[in-house]
From Swiss-Prot:
GO CC field: catalytic step 2 spliceosome; cytoplasm; post-mRNA release spliceosomal complex; post-spliceosomal complex; Prp19 complex; U2-type catalytic step 1 spliceosome; U2-type catalytic step 2 spliceosome
Source lineage: Eukaryota, Fungi, Dikarya, Ascomycota, Saccharomycotina
Principal subcellular localization: cytoplasm
Keyword Nucleus: yes
Chain coiled-coil ranges: none
Signal peptide: none
Protein name: Pre-mRNA-splicing factor ISY1
Subunit structure: Associated with the spliceosome.
Pfam families attached to this UniProt entry: Isy1
Length: 240
């Protein structure tokens, strides 16, 4: 009997919602399943209402993930659901901004803060999810990487400071930026003198005469000549 009463009340509630929607335009979006294909929603007001439902679900999940009675598996499930909701919210906001010419929610700072959480390797972690062992390990690695980057930046700043100090102490003379008076004239005169020497040397006969052969000897002839030369040297050494 009670099931029939509940069923009748449910039918009555749906009928009342339908009447209210037809007469005043009111629609309880929380009782409907959100569309997964956001691009199919062409009405700006309807898209904004669906986004509001996502924001409400995010608020409820953020409150739920702080519950101290949750175990690690439940915490991970809620945190994964929060990340999914954030992605859905971004899809609605992008559709509203680009396709429906609606407001840009990225620049709006009112209402529920839905940009919270700690982002680690592209994943947001909320509430007690930050206490999970593997998340603590990721946080430690992130902190070590941050310290390493800060140390690297500090070393670069120290090196720049040393370079500036060297430039101030050594001055432009060390780097050859200031040319002493008469240096350019001397270098030009010396260059002309060296060019004259090279030209005069080019006109003289070379000190080493390169023989001209009617034909080049073969490899066998060269080897025979080397053998004969070694034989003569050996005979001279032995006084033969």
């Amino acid at each position: 009997m009670s099931r029939n009463v509940d069923k009748a009340n449910s039918v009555l509630a749906r009928y009342q919602e339908l009447v209210a929607e037809n007469t005043s335009g009111y629609k309880d979006y929380s009782r409907f399943k959100r569309p997964t294909a956001v691009h199919r929603i062409s009405n700006l007001e309807e898209a904004q209402r669906w986004r509001a439902e996502v924001v409400k679900d995010i608020g409820n999940k953020v409150t739920q993930i702080h519950d101290p009675s949750l175990n690690e598996m439940q915490i991970e499930d809620i945190n994964n659901e929060l990340n999914r909701l954030f992605q859905e919210k971004m899809r609605w906001e992008s559709h509203i901004r680009r396709n429906l010419r609606g407001p840009d929610y990225r620049r709006m700072k009112q209402g529920l803060n839905t940009t919270g959480g700690t982002v680690i390797n592209g994943t947001r972690y909320f509430g007690r999810a930050l206490e999970l062992p593997h998340v603590q390990e990721l946080l430690q690695q992130q902190q070590q990487q941050r310290v390493k980057q800060q140390n690297q930046k500090q070393r670069e700043q120290e090196l720049r400071a040393k370079v500036r100090q060297w430039e101030e102490e050594l001055g432009p003379d060390y780097y050859g930026e200031d040319v002493p008076p008469g240096m350019q004239e001397y270098e030009a005169q010396r260059s002309r003198e060296l060019q004259d020497i090279l030209r005069s040397a080019a006109g003289r006969a070379p000190q080493v005469q390169i023989p001209l052969f009617e034909r080049l000897p073969t490899q066998e002839e060269v080897e025979g000549w080397l053998v004969e030369r070694r034989r003569k040297r050996l005979q001279e050494r032995l006084d033969l």
